[in-house]
């Protein structure tokens, strides 16, 4: 047994577990919910327009007038009831969740507990979509449906929902699918690296075993590196675009920092395993080159020819 093979074995297992957790984060209610890729905050949806409408009540085409046409006196009651706590109750009065989180396999939604303005508020998950590769959920359709059955029975059109947000969310859905595929590849090669490390543990650092393990770890590293880069760039850029577009109606988005951390750590761990195997290959090659070569006479003598 070659106990030094435990090093790449542990590294490969670490990358496998971290990648697996990142892939399945949020796939059911309450499971690693805070490891989302992007989270949308809807707790202030319509809040800015509410202020604008209150200040410009003389405008017959104001947002408040349109809401009143749809919900009659419902929104007026909301203004009186909510008062200074509008940030805590507006989403509830509209009939939507306060946040929506995008994971690699689904979309979850819920409320901030105990409320959105509380320090260190935690995420109370109320529902998640069915897990599938790259959730590809139409958030506009989901919100419109929730608003239509809410207390005020309004629509996104009444809230001046910008069409550009859906275009941005479509891009986010595409890079979520790309990340999903890359993580599946990374998990697969990390698993093969585990098996290869076990082979090295029992069989020794043979040339074929070393090269095979190096190939497995390099391919896993490439997949996880690409996934981490797409996550970091795509999530941050997607959140930035949503913030720019949705600021006027109170929508904000945030890239998942915890997901990025676990993603980069998984890459770093499997990359360390790849470095180990290339170092092991170099050491083995140097040892073979320094080994004394027997002469033809010595070989014949060992075979009993003399």
What is the predicted function of each stretch?
Residues 1-115:
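Beta-strand-rich luminal/extracellular ectodomains of secretory-pathway glycoproteins
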Residues 177, 184-230, 279-284, 288:
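Juxtamembrane interface at the cytosolic side of transmembrane helices
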Residues 242-258:
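Short, membrane-exposed interhelical loops at transmembrane-helix boundaries
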Residues 1, 58, 284-306:
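Intrinsically disordered, low-complexity terminal tails of fungal membrane proteins
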Residues 3-12, 179-186, 207-217, 256-266:
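Transmembrane alpha-helices of multi-pass eukaryotic membrane proteins
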Residues 121-189:
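Membrane-proximal, non-transmembrane alpha-helical segments
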């Amino acid at each position: 047994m070659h106990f030094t093979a435990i090093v790449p074995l542990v590294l490969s297992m670490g990358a496998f577990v971290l990648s697996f957790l990142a892939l399945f984060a949020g796939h059911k209610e309450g499971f690693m919910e805070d490891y989302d890729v992007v989270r949308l905050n809807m707790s202030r949806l319509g809040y800015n327009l509410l202020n604008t409408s209150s200040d410009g009540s003389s405008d017959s085409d104001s947002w408040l007038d349109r809401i009143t046409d749809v919900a009659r006196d419902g929104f007026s009651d909301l203004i009186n009831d909510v008062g200074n706590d509008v940030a805590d109750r507006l989403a509830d009065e509209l009939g939507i969740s306060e946040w929506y989180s995008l994971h690699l396999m689904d979309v979850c939604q819920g409320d901030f507990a105990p409320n959105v303005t509380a320090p260190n508020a935690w995420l109370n998950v109320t529902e998640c979509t069915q897990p599938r590769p790259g959730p590809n959920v139409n958030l506009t359709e989901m919100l419109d449906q929730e608003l239509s059955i809410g207390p005020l029975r309004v629509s996104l059109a009444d809230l001046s929902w910008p069409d550009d947000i859906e275009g941005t969310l479509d891009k986010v859905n595409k890079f979520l699918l790309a990340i999903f595929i890359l993580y599946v590849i990374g998990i697969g090669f990390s698993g093969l690296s585990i098996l290869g490390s076990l082979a090295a543990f029992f069989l020794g650092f043979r040339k074929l075993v070393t090269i095979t393990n190096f190939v497995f770890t390099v391919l896993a590293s490439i997949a996880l590196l690409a996934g981490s880069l797409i996550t970091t760039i795509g999530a941050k850029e997607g959140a930035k675009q949503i913030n720019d577009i949705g600021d006027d109606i109170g929508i904000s988005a945030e890239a998942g920092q915890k997901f990025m951390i676990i993603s980069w750590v998984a890459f770093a761990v499997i990359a360390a395993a790849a470095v180990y195997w290339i170092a092991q290959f170099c050491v083995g090659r140097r040892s073979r080159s320094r080994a004394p070569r027997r002469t033809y006479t010595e070989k014949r003598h060992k075979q009993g020819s003399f």
